[in-house]
């Protein structure tokens, strides 16, 4: 596999009762590239993303992350995250009653904070680097929908992901 390829999917198949959603899909993503999946309703865009992120298991095919065959390992979104695959959902999946920083770090094994001040400082740095107009200590519910989505992106970016 090419050293620039951060993601490669080969011959991916996925079927549901009475429907073949994916038939032999091949796809690769080089480091630094941005791609968009486009197609008609029912074309398999969401299914492909859900196979990649471990929401659905694939019927056939291989998935490589940084040249390593990870197809056997991706059986849940948590396993996908450990492999460096992070997801920002179209629907906001954050907790409005928590602060921005709490939303960025909740449920994360790679960043555990005992010190709230340090957590807020780290979150503020990330927000500032990404030009997100929010403060770490701010309640998420007080942010606009657009800023809430930016916080979700900041959370994903800060996970040191290879594929977002």
Protein language model features and the residues they cover:
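Glycine-rich phosphate-binding loops of nucleotide-dependent enzymes
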Residues: 1-164
């Amino acid at each position: 596999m090419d050293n620039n390829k951060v993601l490669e999917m080969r011959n991916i198949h996925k079927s549901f009762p009475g429907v073949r959603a994916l038939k032999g899909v091949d796809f690769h993503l080089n480091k630094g590239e941005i791609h968009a999946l486009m197609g008609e309703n029912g074309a398999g865009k969401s299914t492909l993303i859900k196979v990649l992120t471990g929401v659905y298991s694939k019927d056939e095919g291989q998935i490589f992350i940084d040249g390593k065959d990870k197809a056997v390992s991706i059986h849940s979104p948590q396993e996908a995250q450990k492999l460096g695959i992070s997801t920002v959902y179209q629907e906001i999946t954050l907790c409005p009653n928590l602060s921005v920083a709490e939303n960025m770090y909740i449920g994360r094994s790679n960043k555990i904070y005992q010190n709230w001040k340090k957590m807020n400082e780290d979150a503020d740095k990330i927000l500032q680097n990404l030009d997100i107009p929010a403060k770490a200590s701010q309640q998420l519910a007080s942010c606009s929908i657009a800023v809430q989505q930016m916080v979700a992106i900041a959370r994903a970016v800060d996970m040191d992901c290879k594929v977002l």
